[in-house]
Amino acid sequence: MSQTRDLQGGKAFGLLKAQQEERLDEINKQFLDDPKYSSDEDLLSKLEGFKEKYMEFDLNGNGDIDIMSLKRMLEKLGVPKTHLELKKLIGEVSSGSGETFSYPDFLRMMLGKRSAILKMILMYEEKAREKEKPTGPPAKKAISELP
């Protein structure tokens, strides 16, 4: 058995998350200074919330969310997607490779006016949602509406 075993895995993970948080704070500062997003209400709290969510699903701390992390994120949000849908979503959001997307891509997606990924999620949600049947007595019909 090795004598040089590192028993501080939690400490190393904490340092990794602290470094990641510093990097994301720098990116948040860039978005706060960007005039494109200056009209957004409560931008600081939105960015903080997005940072927390991003850190929750960027488990390896490399700064990118891959397809499996996105799948887990959407499942946790109650919007599970197929592998093909996820690939399309990442392709639309990603500014670089088609396999992952970065934190700035994530912020542009979330802060954009009805972004592509949000539109796709809403579209799939509408398709999945069944029309509710009206309850109560049927509405009265006029003679002209009868067959």
Swiss-Prot record:
User: What is the membrane topology listed in the Swiss-Prot or TrEMBL record?
Assistant: Peripheral membrane protein
N-acetylserine occurs at which residues?
S2
Q: Do the record's keywords include Metal-binding?
A: yes
**In this chain, where does the modification Phosphoserine occur?**
S39
Q: GO BP, one example?
A: positive regulation of T cell proliferation
Q: Where in the cell is it found?
A: Cytoplasm, Cytoskeleton; Cell projection, Ruffle membrane; Cell projection, Phagocytic cup
Under the heading PROSITE patterns, the entry gives: EF_HAND_2 (PS50222)
One Gene Ontology cellular component: perinuclear region of cytoplasm
Pfam families under this entry? AIF-1
Q: Which residues carry this modification: N6-acetyllysine?
A: K11
- Please indicate which superkingdom the organism of origin belongs to: Eukaryota
Query: Residues that bind Ca(2+) 1, according to the entry?
Result: D58, N60, N62, D64
Q: How is it modified after translation?
A: Phosphorylated on serine residues.
Major subcellular location class = cytoplasm
* Region described as Disordered: spans on this chain: 128-147
Which of UniProt's keywords are assigned here?
Answer: Acetylation, Actin-binding, Calcium, Cell membrane, Cell projection, Cytoplasm, Cytoskeleton, Membrane, Metal-binding, Phosphoprotein, Repeat
Record's PANTHER family? ALLOGRAFT INFLAMMATORY FACTOR 1 (PTHR10356:SF4), ALLOGRAFT INFLAMMATORY FACTOR-1 (PTHR10356)
- What's this protein's name? Allograft inflammatory factor 1
Q: Which organism is it from?
A: Macaca mulatta (Rhesus macaque)
